Amino acid sequence: MHRKGGQTLRLYTHFLLHLSPHHHSFLDSIWQRKMVHPSSAFHPYTRPIPTTSGHDLPVDDSLRLLLSAEALIALAQLQDASKILPSYEPVKDFSPQLLPAMTPTPIIATPSIPEQPQPLQSPSAPNEKSRRKRTTFSPEQATRLEAEYIGDSYMAREKRHLLAQSLKLSENQVKTWFQNRRAKDKRDRKSENASNHTSNSRRSSPSRKSSSDSTPTPTQATQFDMPTQIQTASPPTTADSAIFPPTSPESIIQKIEQFPSNQILPNFDILQTYLQSLSSSQIPLQFVPSTPPLFDPNMLQLYHVIFEFSQSETCSVSFQRNSASNMRSLLIFVFFATIFAVDAQYDSADSSQSEDLPDIAPESVSSEEIIEVDVNIEGSGSGDGPIIDQVHMFGILPGPGDIRKKRGILEILGRK
């Protein structure tokens, strides 16, 4: 800190300067040009600060102590600026690409030592040193080695040493040749086994295919398309043999549980139309089944259908000259037709009719509806089994609607 004319001057520098008389004259010329505005000659950090002191310093002494930014720039442009020595050394441990800000721009240009160009090294150069040279055997050597290998693939050390001397080869070369030859044989055996396995599999595949083709595919027995409540537990042939034993011509009574009609046949109109067509025709008919069909039309090839009715409690329906193989379908057909007709008549009956009906005792009311089918067999057919003469259906209906339902059956059959 220096004082001049009641002003305090602060100077901050980090450089060690060696000024020659030539430099002093240069600074004096700069100060003379700046005398018009003395404050402009100072650096912003070295401008005078007013103080109360009254001591004065000569102008020449102040010029030697003050360094402005313009003086430093001018000194850097001088030819003999090599005398300016920085007070620190550049860091050599870090590369300029990683820390560019830490490497200052050198003011002094030092002559660089030219680097000697180094020959480029290929990437495979390190491997070439460790890689062994490939030995080329002459035809005579290869023939002799092959003959010895056929005789003994695992040669003893003494014999291998003698063989190497006779062939003018080293023992390691002979040993390596035998190792490579054994590895080649191993690869050949693996490939041969794989090819044999492939050929065997190709030969066996046609036989498997032919055996699968010769196996007959079991055909599914034709079943009626009905709801889940009614399922056929055995094929028709078993049912026919059970219903019509070949040695016993006696009558067989079967009891079949009755199911709700709305779950068995939703399309009652189709069945009613079918019944009308059967009653009006006297010749065999060909039917087109609906989708899905209730029964197979081929199973109902009837020659003639006659509906018999009476005033008794028993409703009798007769079929003439029907084959035994179609009996199962006939029973199902007659059973369903009777139930649907009764339900339709019962739903449309007037409530006034129920007043004229006699009362039924409570003990006569049953918990379920049972239909008994009585089959009468007479004689035998021409190749189709016994001929069915009559099929009688007996309706036992529950509740107060007993008699009314039976009368409904008779009325419907009477209109036919």
UniProtKB/Swiss-Prot annotation:
It is found in: Nucleus. Residues 118-127, 219-240 have a biased composition (Polar residues). Pfam families: Homeodomain (PF00046). Disulfide bonds: none annotated. Gene3D superfamilies: Homeodomain-like (1.10.10.60). Keywords: DNA-binding, Homeobox, Nucleus. PROSITE patterns: HOMEOBOX_1 (PS00027), HOMEOBOX_2 (PS50071). Residues 103-113, 193-218 have a biased composition (Low complexity). GO terms for cellular component: nucleus. Residues 103-144, 178-247 are annotated as: Disordered. It comes from the Eukaryota. One of its GO terms (molecular function) is DNA-binding transcription factor activity, RNA polymerase II-specific. Residues 130-189 bind DNA. Its main location: nucleus. The keyword ATP-binding does not apply. This is Homeobox protein ceh-62. It comes from Caenorhabditis elegans.
